Amino acid sequence: MPSVGIVIGDGKKEYPGKLTLYVTVTCIVAAMGGLIFGYDIGISGGVTTMDSFQQKFFPSVYEKQKKDHDSNQYCRFDSVSLTLFTSSLYLAALCSSLVASYVTRQFGRKISMLLGGVLFCAGALLNGFATAVWMLIVGRLLLGFGIGFTNQSVPLYLSEMAPYKYRGALNIGFQLSITIGILVANVLNFFFSKISWGWRLSLGGAVVPALIITVGSLILPDTPNSMIERGQFRLAEAKLRKIRGVDDIDDEINDLIIASEASKLVEHPWRNLLQRKYRPHLTMAILIPAFQQLTGINVIMFYAPVLFQTIGFGSDAALISAVVTGLVNVGATVVSIYGVDKWGRRFLFLEGGFQMLISQVAVAAAIGAKFGVDGTPGVLPKWYAIVVVLFICIYVAAFAWSWGPLGWLVPSEIFPLEIRSAAQSITVSVNMIFTFLIAQVFLMMLCHLKFGLFIFFAFFVVVMSIFVYLFLPETRGVPIEEMNRVWRSHWYWSKFVDAEKNLTKVVI
């Protein structure tokens, strides 16, 4: 290949390339990594409402639920041990994401996906055959280790493999897989709840999505970015040519090598994140995943059956309602695949925030009007139940085409290569910290804040929408290695990012 002069600056650069069948299939297979995360989110809440599961592992919760059926509905499921069962996974995911950063950088994205699948598979088997609470907890920890690795590697893999014009749509495949996993889990919970040992099938069924990503990672190629990072220049060149479906890849391969050479000068990527020029990246790595969880979505998806049961639905009706929200989740995520590269990230963030705000206030008013502050139960009229489910579905739809997919897409596409693995690790870690905290205290918050819990999350939706409006630049249609120019042109972040244009010549 001849030497090529590459200008990296504020001028927009367009790399040639097509949306080939090869890259589409590759990204679909990789996106399946989201199935394990989604399946766990959906299965946990449903299993905890099954009488046979409660009787075996959490008898105090079961007895309290049956004994106090006519008392405060807000506090029926308030149990430290029950919430620890759900939230312990996220502490494990937090720890493993830090290790996954090193593995992803040194050994490639696909190795991290493979480890994630194997660990999740082991946890699923242990949970399926559990006979004591400690087996459940250890199984949950293994599941968490697996999720930490996949959530670290899959979004990066998708952003690096996809042509920049289609990066948003292909990356959202990860979130779509999460929503499909949630839906499948809710459907299985509904059917398995009829069987006395159905909880074993629900928990053990996690082996299936684990095997999908495990086998998938064995046949997937690694990304050209990762190959170059590990010195495999010729292999990366051949792979990029196959991925893009064109021979003219000189500009893109040179920019990838420039980014790789810059990354090698960084001895301590974690410490480097604290440098002034990476201030916008670090801010987004922390606040976007934190805000994603403060929308309250995982409260709905974790505990949808518990929540619906709490507000007066029967056990079967609660699981059916959870299936309905799961269907909405999948459908709205498909909308985001269409719209993210057409309407842009900022539009979806802001529209979704407004829609979530209205829905949360409406749900709070509906639940508050029915149960008041003392949680006095009563028979929920059918029309009233439909109204509650309708607004929850509107809320889920808003999240599913905004903060759901974009909470993973935007961080994975804005980090330069030299800090990419470390910054993505922070994104996953913050996501898991907030997921753990909210999952751990949700039932207690429901007991004390009552319907005000939805107002609590609505407040943060307002805060995050203001943040997006003021501080998040549009990243649609910007090549991943050219992302620095969006910070240079931003009214605030330009103060931190070096505005000088660099002219670099690289000879391969």
Curated annotation (Swiss-Prot):
Topology in the lipid bilayer: Multi-pass membrane protein
Main subcellular localisation: membrane
Alphabetical UniProt keywords: Membrane, Sugar transport, Symport, Transmembrane, Transmembrane helix, Transport
Subcellular location: Membrane
SUPFAM superfamilies recorded: MFS general substrate transporter
Role according to the record: Mediates an active uptake of hexoses, probably by sugar/hydrogen symport.
Listed NCBIfam families: SP (TIGR00879)
Name of the protein in question: Sugar transport protein 12
Species, as recorded: Arabidopsis thaliana (Mouse-ear cress)
A Pfam family: Sugar_tr
Record field: transmembrane: 23-43, 80-100, 118-138, 141-161, 172-192, 201-221, 294-314, 317-337, 347-367, 383-403, 426-446, 451-471
Residue intervals annotated with topology Cytoplasmic: 1-22, 472-508
